[in-house]
Structure formats: C-alpha cells, structure tokens
Regions:
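Gram-negative bacterial Sec-dependent N-terminal signal peptides
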Residues: 1-23
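Transmembrane beta-strands of outer-membrane beta-barrel pores
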Residues: 31-39, 68-74, 103-109, 117-119, ...
Length: 303
C-alpha cells in the first residue's frame, strides 16, 4: 500500500465510531500582524496571518492532528497569499514508540504570476521517553504543472526535550530532493534550532534559528527570530497570550545579499491543556513543530 492510500485510509478510519474512551482535545490559535522592511526598497510588507493547530487523543493510542495556516502579504502594490493544511494520524505504543501517516497541502498565490500548490504525504515514526521526543518522516510531494518524470522526496528528523523546569529546546533537520531522469539531484536542506523559557508572572522568552540551503545555485536563507509572550490570565480573566517577535532574514544567492527585518505581534488562544506561550507561526514554532517538507518549512518560516 502506497503512502498516499495509507493517509486516505487513516483519515477515513477517524470518522468511524469508536468505544467511549478518555478522549482529550487540545489546540491553539494565533492571530498575527507583521511589518517587514526589505533592504534597498522603499516599501514595507504588511502581513496578516491566522494559524491553528489541534489534536485529538482517543485514549487508546490513536491520535489525530490538524494544522492550518494562512497569511496575506501586501507591499502596497502586489499581494501574496500563502496557505497550509495538514492532517496527521498516529498510533502510540506503551513503550513510547509511535507510527503514523501525514497528508499536507501548501499553496502560494502571487499577483500577476498565478498560484502553485504542493501536496505532500508520507509516513512518520517517533519515540518519547522522560521528556525527550524523537521523530522522523519519509514521504513524497507533488507540485502542480511540474513536467512528468520529476520527483520530490521529503525526509527529516526532529528532537525536542522538555525534561527540565520551565524550558523547552528543539532541533529540526529536513531535506527535499528533486530528481529527474538524466539530471543531477537538487537538494533543499533545512536546519533549525529553537527553545523557550518560562519566566515568572506569566512571561515567556522564545527564539529560533532556521537555515535553508539550495545547492544547485548556491543559495542560503537564514532566519533568526526572538520574542516574548505574556499570559493575559495572570492579570485578567482572558484565556489568551500576547506576543512580540523580532525576525531577521538574510538571503545570499551566488554572492548577492538581501535582508529583511520583521516585527510581529500575536494574540494566541490555547484550547484544552495546550500552552500558547510560543505563538504559532513564530520562527521558534516552525522548528519545534515542523512540517513535513523543506519547501513548506522554508516558505512559512522566513516572514
């Protein structure tokens, strides 16, 4: 059975009636506003974003997840819209191991150039013990209108540790390989590291560093984001957190440089038992909760 049909069968299985168990739902939603200044230009880019991530634990080892994101970028003349939707299904064993499947779709729409859609699907495996979580994935992607005979292969691994008081750290490595008959493979590599630390009285510091490298044209994109969030429930009855993040992105293509500085404001609402101290869509979040393609990870971490 191919990964595509494994994804479909898992999603269909989630709709079937199951015995009444101790089901647990959690999630978070983040509404974001950003201002980006790009070097050597007179215009700023305004970004409005909405991210949501939700999980359902059936209480019998089965867990399902939903990841949604959309953002509109406007420089005063042209608009760009990016969107993402992903579903996951996994089964956790009593020894801490897990196996699962995923299906994702990323879409980019740019004024004057039309749109492009990428669909990804594959398998996941993980192991969790004493605050440490190691996961890996392997899958394939399809992009609209690509010539036949071109294949996109995705694989990667991530590590996250929350075993010490008030802190969380994570590491993410991914590669997407484009291969075609008679041509040399093209690799897009992503490496990220991130963490967060809960301070006193509802304050949390978070930060992430992500780098993407495309070997065929010697292109590198480096993004650094640092921020702080505040839990409004410490001072009000609102179950929400506000955040401020400063992001610096640097692009180097064959020796030509460009950079951009972004200031992001966020309002995050936690659902169930999930924390909203690290806002969804932040650089730290893209490393701590990575997607399953180096292409989509790069698209959503830079701005």
């Amino acid at each position: 059975m191919t990964p595509r049909y494994l994804v479909i069968s898992t999603i269909l299985a989630s709709a079937l009636p199951l015995p009444l168990l101790a089901q647990t739902f959690d999630g978070a939603v983040t509404l974001g506003y950003g201002q980006t200044n790009v070097s050597d230009t007179d215009s700023d880019v305004t970004t409005l974003s909405l991210d949501g991530r939700f999980g359902l634990d059936m209480g019998n080892g089965l867990r399902f997840g939903l990841d949604l994101a959309t953002a509109s970028l406007d420089d005063g003349e042209d608009d760009m819209t990016r969107s993402f939707a992903g579903v996951t299904g996994s089964y956790g064993f009593q020894n801490g191991a897990s196996l699962g499947v995923y299906g994702e779709q990323a879409r980019l729409d740019l004024d004057g150039f039309g749109d492009a859609t990428m669909k990804s699907y594959g398998l996941t495996a993980g192991y969790e013990a004493e605050g440490a979580l190691v996961t890996g994935f392997y899958g394939e992607s399809d992009i609209d209108d690509l010539p036949s005979g071109i294949d996109l292969t995705d694989f990667g691994a991530s590590f996250r540790y929350s075993g010490f008081a008030n802190g969380l750290v994570g590491l993410n490595l991914q590669r997407t390989t484009l291969s075609a008959d008679g041509l040399e493979d093209v690799d897009l590599d992503v490496l990220g590291v991130a963490g967060s630390y809960d301070l006193q009285a509802g304050w949390t510091l978070f930060g992430g560093l992500a780098g993407a490298s495309l070997d065929v044209i010697d292109a590198d994109l480096t993004t650094l984001g640092v921020g702080v969030s505040y839990d409004l429930s410490q001072a009000t009855q609102a179950n929400a957190a506000v955040s401020l993040e400063l992001v610096r992105s640097e692009l180097d293509v064959m020796g030509l440089d460009a950079d951009a500085t972004t200031v992001r404001l966020g309002l995050s609402i936690p659902l169930g038992g999930r924390s909203a101290s690290v806002p969804l869509g932040s650089v730290a979040d893209t490393v701590l909760n990575p997607r399953h393609s180096a292409l989509s990870s790069t698209l959503f971490s830079a701005f």
